[in-house]
Amino acid sequence: AFAMCFIFFIAFGGYNIYFTPTSIISIDINPSIEIGINRLNKVISVEGYNEDGVDFANSLDILYDDYEDAIDEVLQSDTIRTCLAKDEFLSVAVVEIDGTQSEDILQYVSNCTSGHKNAYCYGLSSDDASSAHSLGLSYGKYNIYQELHSCGSHITPEEASEMTMKELRQMLYDLDPESENASSQNYSCDNYSSE
């Protein structure tokens, strides 16, 4: 009986370790998706945060891949390449939930996107992004949504969810041309900062 309990405990514990996210990669351009990463650097979830995001998430075959392979597939997808070719803005936020891998993930994502003129990568703590999902927003869109509200905008979460990052940045620029997130300058992920 003890042996069976021990095996159950080990199996249950292993399951929890494997399927508990320690970092989230939030990719916003419209579509908006979030990729959950476990402590073993494996993709354990892919979720869309708007209609386009749900369609895009469903089209990806990255579940249980290493995050490097998953990021490569996402960034090389026709969906993302088409958006970037239309001069859309790509925001990639790496959210650390538990652990220390987010800096490595952020560095990898930054290297992958450094050739794109309209890409911005940054780190967020889970505390900074705790309210995003309750509003139905991905972490990346929530970050700019908060800035819009601090500048006096009355945009709703639903409106923000369906807008492209380029549209949200333009709205922020119109309200506050000095805002880092709204700058009309192109961002490069080589100069990311973990907040």
Which residues does each PLM region occupy?
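Single-pass transmembrane signal-anchor helices and their membrane-water interface zones
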Residues: 1-23
